[in-house]
Structure formats: C-alpha cells, structure tokens
Amino acid sequence: MTDILRRIEAYKRGEIAAAKVRIPLAELKARIAEQSPPRGFRAALGAHREKGDFGLIAEIKKASPSKGLIRPDFDPPELAKAYAAGGAACLSVLTDAPSFQGAPEFLTKAREACPLPALRKDFMFDTYQVFEARAWGADCILLIMASLADDDARRLEEAAFALGMDVLVEVHDAEEMDRALRLSSPLVGINNRNLRTFEVDLAVSERLATMVSSDHLLVGESGVFTHEDCRRLEKSGITTFLVGESLMRKDDVEAATRALLTGSANILAAE
C-alpha cells in the first residue's frame, strides 16, 4: 500500500467509527428497506457492450487532491442529466470529503435526477460502508485492490452482493489483477494512473487486458480523454471507460460526453 493510501485509510477508519456511533447499522438497514431496488450497474454496461457501443461510467467529482476544485459551478443533478443525455451508461459519484470534497448527498441527488445506475466512488474498508452506499442509493461499490487484503475484499464483495449491488474491482498491476480475478465480480477496472508517481499510461490497460477472459467486463480508468483513446483501448477488448475530470471541465458536458463516445466533434481535448 502506498503512503497516500495509508493516509487515506487512517482518516477513513476514523470516519467509519464516528459514523457507526452517529447512525447505527440498524438505522442504515431501515433506510435500505425504503429504497427502490438497485438499478443494475453491470447490466447497464453489458447492454451497451452487447449493442456494440462504448459504455461510459461518467464521473461526478468536485475536486481532486492534486488539482483542487475542478468545476466551480458544481451541480450534481444537472451533471447527471447531462451525462445521461450524452449517452453515458452509468454514473460514478465521489463521496469522500477530505480528498475530493465529496458528499453522500451528491450521490443521492445525482441518482434521483436521472435513470442511470450509480457507483459510490470512495475508499472502502468496512462492510458498514457498503450499507451506507445502498442507503444513499448506490447501485455499485468500488474495491481498490491496492488498499485491501484479499479477505477484506471478499467480505466487502459479499456484503454488496447480499444487498443486490454490483462491485467494480480496481487494479493497476499484474499482481492486483491476479488477486481481482479470484473474486466473484466480473467487473474489473484497470487504473492507468500510477498512485506512486501519478503518471498515466494507457499501455497499463493494454498490458493487463491480456490476463482476462471474455467473461469479464473490463473498464479503462484514467487517461481516456478522446474518442481516439477509446478506439485504441477497443483493440485490447476494452469498450467500457470511467471518465470524469476531462468531461467535468467542459462547458457543454452533454456534447462532450457524446463526442467522447461517438467522435461526433473534436471538443474533448486532453486536459
């Protein structure tokens, strides 16, 4: 685990402990009982793949540790509507506050504003967070293999499945991919960003994709800025992408989303 992930785990553990006191698990379960069923995150991505279309997990992210505020006029419901109108298959919403200025209500309001399934994008360490995610309306959780032992990842995955949710398992290298493939989820995200150096290289996805059979659905994460980037990864069997910052910075988010997916206009230059 990198120093960055250790620091994040330390503050997340503190957040989790405080949340368990503030909102007991029984209360979360009661809120979940009032939720409509999960929308089917993996199914939405699979439907795009079956039609031969690119599948986009469009991210709603207010800020990042390295670049600060990303979008001054940050409006999660309007962004969700724009992504949906532009052809996105799913949403990814940051809920981590210390590093990304995220919040639970961003997820809840974005999901309420459109028909797309939503991922809780956060650092998951405790099954309590899985119940939180479902109570907030999430349809999928993220497991970052670089921050989790195998037993912890399996326990989090099982908790999500029990709630009818999907699981996106994120990897960056061959060792993490090997571990991810021992889990049950067929959704595997390849992060092209090195968390130690922050360098981004699409070759990471191209290299790791060779380890995966066709029964898995691969997601290219980070470094996808243009339709040409999508076409490049398509050659390695990756037709689903998680993209956020480059879309969030555009004045016309709907048009930028459409351009990324279809190449309809050259308006999505790399940031």
Curated annotation (Swiss-Prot):
Q: Which reaction does it catalyse?
A: 1-(2-carboxyphenylamino)-1-deoxy-D-ribulose 5-phosphate + H(+) = (1S,2R)-1-C-(indol-3-yl)glycerol 3-phosphate + CO2 + H2O
Listed GO molecular functions? indole-3-glycerol-phosphate synthase activity; phosphoribosylanthranilate isomerase activity
Residue ranges of the TM segments: none
Identify the EC number(s): 4.1.1.48
One Pfam family name is: IGPS
Instruction: Tell me which SUPFAM superfamilies the record gives.
Output: Ribulose-phoshate binding barrel
A GO BP entry is: L-tryptophan biosynthetic process
Which keywords label this protein? Amino-acid biosynthesis, Aromatic amino acid biosynthesis, Decarboxylase, Lyase, Tryptophan biosynthesis
Question: So, what pathway does this thing act in?
Answer: Amino-acid biosynthesis; L-tryptophan biosynthesis; L-tryptophan from chorismate: step 4/5
Q: Which domain of life is it from?
A: Bacteria
Record-stated family: Belongs to the TrpC family.
- Protein's recorded name: Indole-3-glycerol phosphate synthase
